């Protein structure tokens, strides 16, 4: 069917005679949704409440309200949704997983190119991580115009090609350029994931599914040092990057075969349907042809580009992002610099072998894997932060003391493990809060969250010189104190005044 012949289907999810559009009501009432069916009768009236679609057990109102169309991802089967969540979680691992490979190769690269580990750390790991954050801003602009799937697919293909370039790079400059480009273009799944979860799952299940998705990119920076540290100890650093390229290729293949477009334009009246069906629709959607045809119904370029700037200044978003950015970012900082603490000979470091460093990086992986009403207010999500912050402080202080005073390996493991548990708890709470507060801007929320955590991770640039001069306990203790101060400043304020700010 030609573009001009694009068919449209009227939504049956909202009555024409009603003043309330149930398909977009969750966006209009951002941050405050009626979950209990009985409460809905009081809040919305009997007439509107009788039209609300409920969960299978009849105990919860579904937000967003599903349409009657089989194209609506809210109506997909549980297995179909689970497959898409699995795919986006696998893809979300790629950016930080690839950047983390540099941790395993830092000493071999320094030896091969006759430079210091600090230079290699800054030139490769730090810059590639930094560019992951900025790439997300461009991704969300493209997604608003062309959909989730084509941006996800092409970003992963390009990322795989740049990883291959890093694997085969003949010199350090080429290697660093390939690493940075792979980070910049590969960040799409870390933005798309929040979209996919909210596209497919109703409000009351979103935090649970966000746990699964965030697990992917929280654990990913530690997976590659843990897995490939043993490999680099036996072969060369190129094998580690080659294995990372293979993983990216597997993700691309899975996206090619099984990933689906979850973007559904439920806010348009009537809701536009895809111009093709079957295999042709599959191929055109993957390549971006369908997105080009559907773009005329979606945001203009001006609106897509300006959208991030319309929300970033909001105090309820900016404050919580600074808090989470420092908390998550300092976690990135210790991930990048711990290899130096562990691998440097005494008295500054522990003098671990490549095998010992690789085994130690299994700690945060295990830690994250182990720790997985009527009217709902978004600020309720933030109560989890009261659990996360004390754990974070304990973890950082124990880890700093272990490094400075050369305590047992158990102290290192316990400190790092507790800190990563805290980051997992806090990240899910903050993402869920931001998603609830800005239901029309899930991509922007993901992009700014990604940028905030990366900017917070810039501590790696000065963490090692600081620790050399004043000790690791002071460094990690100050970082924990900064997070605690931001928590006291931001979280109670949002819980008291968040509804008014919204």
Q: Regions from the language model: what does each represent?
A:
Residues 1-80, 259-304, 371-378, 501-502:
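Intrinsically disordered, low-complexity terminal tails of fungal membrane proteins
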Residues 96, 126-129, 133, 140, ...:
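C-terminal transmembrane bundle
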Residues 98, 113-114, 135, 146-147, ...:
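Helix-breaking motifs and short loop linkers at transmembrane-helix boundaries and internal kinks
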Residues 81-99, 180, 313-333, 417-418:
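Pair of pore-lining "gating" transmembrane helices in MFS-fold secondary transporters
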Residues 178-217:
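Cytoplasmic helix-loop-helix junction between adjacent transmembrane helices
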Residues 80-117, 189, 334-340:
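Extracytoplasmic
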Residues 216-266:
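Helix-loop-helix hairpin linking two adjacent transmembrane segments in secondary transporters
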Residues 134-173:
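Conserved MFS/SLC helix-loop-helix module at the cytosolic interface between two early adjacent transmembrane helices
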């Amino acid at each position: 069917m030609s573009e001009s012949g694009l068919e449209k289907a009227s939504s049956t999810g909202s009555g024409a005679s009603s003043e309330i559009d149930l398909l977009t009501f969750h966006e209009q009432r951002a941050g405050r949704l009626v979950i209990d069916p009985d409460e809905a009768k009081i809040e919305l009236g009997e007439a509107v409440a009788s039209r609300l679609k409920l969960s299978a057990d009849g105990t919860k109102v579904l937000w967003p309200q599903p349409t009657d169309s089989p194209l609506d991802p809210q109506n997909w089967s549980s297995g179909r949704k689970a497959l898409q969540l699995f795919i986006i979680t696998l893809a979300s691992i790629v950016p930080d997983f690839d950047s983390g490979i540099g941790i395993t190769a830092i000493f071999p690269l320094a030896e091969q190119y006759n430079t210091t580990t600090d230079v290699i750390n800054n030139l490769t790991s730090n810059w590639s991580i930094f560019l992951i954050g900025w790439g997300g801003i461009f991704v969300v602009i493209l997604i608003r115009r062309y959909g989730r799937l084509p941006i996800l697919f092409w970003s992963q293909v390009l990322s795989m090609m740049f990883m291959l370039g890093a694997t085969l790079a003949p010199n350090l400059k080429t290697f660093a350029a390939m690493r940075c480009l792979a980070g910049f273009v590969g960040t799409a799944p870390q933005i798309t994931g929040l979209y996919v979860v909210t596209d497919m799952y109703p409000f009351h299940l979103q935090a649970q599914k966000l746990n699964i998705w965030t697990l992917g990119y929280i654990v990913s920076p530690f997976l590659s040092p843990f897995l490939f540290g043993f490999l680099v100890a036996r072969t060369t650093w190129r094998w580690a990057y080659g294995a990372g390229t293979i993983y990216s290729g597997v993700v691309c293949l899975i996206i090619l075969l099984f990933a689906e477009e979850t973007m559904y334009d439920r806010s348009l009246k009537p809701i536009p349907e895809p111009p093709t069906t079957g295999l042709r629709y599959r191929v055109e959607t993957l390549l971006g042809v369908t997105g080009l045809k559907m773009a005329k119904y979606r945001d203009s370029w001006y609106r897509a580009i300006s959208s991030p700037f319309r929300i970033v200044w909001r105090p309820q978003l900016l404050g919580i992002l600074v808090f989470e950015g420092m908390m998550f970012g300092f976690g990135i900082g210790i991930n990048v610099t711990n290899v130096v603490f562990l691998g440097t000979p005494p008295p500054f470091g522990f003098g671990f072998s490549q095998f010992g460093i690789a085994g130690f990086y299994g700690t945060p992986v295990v830690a994250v894997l182990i720790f997985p009403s009527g009217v709902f207010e978004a600020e309720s999500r933030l109560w989890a932060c009261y659990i996360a912050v004390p754990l974070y402080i304990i973890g950082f202080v124990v880890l700093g003391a272990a490094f400075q005073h050369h305590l047992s390996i158990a102290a290192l493991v316990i400190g790092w493990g507790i800190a990563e548990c805290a980051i997992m708890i806090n990240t899910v709470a903050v993402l869920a809060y931001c998603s609830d507060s800005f239901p029309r801007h899930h991509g922007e929320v993901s992009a700014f969250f990604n940028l905030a955590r990366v900017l917070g991770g810039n501590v790696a640039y000065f963490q090692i010189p600081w620790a050399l001069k004043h000790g690791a306990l002071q460094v990690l203790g100050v970082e924990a104190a900064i997070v605690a101060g931001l928590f006291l400043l931001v979280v109670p304020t949002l819980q008291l005044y968040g509804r008014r700010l919204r």
